[in-house]
Amino acid sequence: MSTDSVTRIAHLSDLHCGSPHFKADLLERAIEEINELRPEVAVISGDLTTDGFEREYRTAREFVDRIECADLIVVPGNHDSRNVGYIHFEELFGPRAQTLHKHGLTIVAEDSSEPDLDHGQIGRNRYPHIEGEFAGFANLNLFVLHHHLLPIPGTGRERNIVYDAGDLLELLLRSRVKLVLAGHKHVPYAWHIESMFVVTTGTVSTLRLRGHGRPCYNVIEVGPEWVRIYRKYPFEGQEPIIEFSRETHEYEKHGLGAVT
């Protein structure tokens, strides 16, 4: 637990346990770095496995159990739902949708995966639940899913946003969501749309990378008046991405065009 007024969230994605590209030393180092930060919450936005097999899930669970935090939020990705893998997810990680009202945050996490398909959607049947979870709270609102909510440069021609992205964006903006966290295509990026930031992280522990990408994860620091987001590279330090005001929504971007 932080000793100051800052709440910290570690955001990891795309572990891909079982992949020939998986590097255990990267994940071990990331977990060491995260534990040094002592975050209140750890968020894992899917693709813990490569093919959804039970043995891959058990490996992922062993690593995740090493993360020291008060609250853990995990959703499945498209790889996790292969081979009926969502059954193993529920057995080892619990419900595929979670909500946390704590630490001055409201975090709603939803499963965007479809069995044996790479594309995803949330589905309008989930909209009333999502809107209800955000209603009546004065906290900082965050939404978590695996797939992209907006297109990401450098991710190819695959349709990798959720099919119902437009409706979901409108719902989240109406619900005063300030930050969306996702993974999926191993390309870290950030969009600013109206009063909301949509931030993806890359893969934390595989070398299945695009171009000059590097394994990475994000750390979010939430202060009383501001939010800061950093991109961290296991073994290789960190760089700031965004800082924004919780009240005025003014923001400062960092890096080479990382935020648009």
Give residue ranges: language-model regions:
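A short C-terminal boundary segment appended to hydrolase-like catalytic domains
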Residues: T3, G223-T260
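Short acidic, glycine-rich surface-loop motifs adjacent to enzyme active sites
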Residues: F137-G154
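Active-site neighborhood of phospho(di)ester-bond hydrolases with catalytic His/Asp-centered motifs
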Residues: L12-S13, A42-D47, D71-N78, D111, ...
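Beta-strand-turn-beta hairpins that frame and shape the catalytic cleft
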Residues: M1-A10, T99-A109, A135-L142, I193-V198
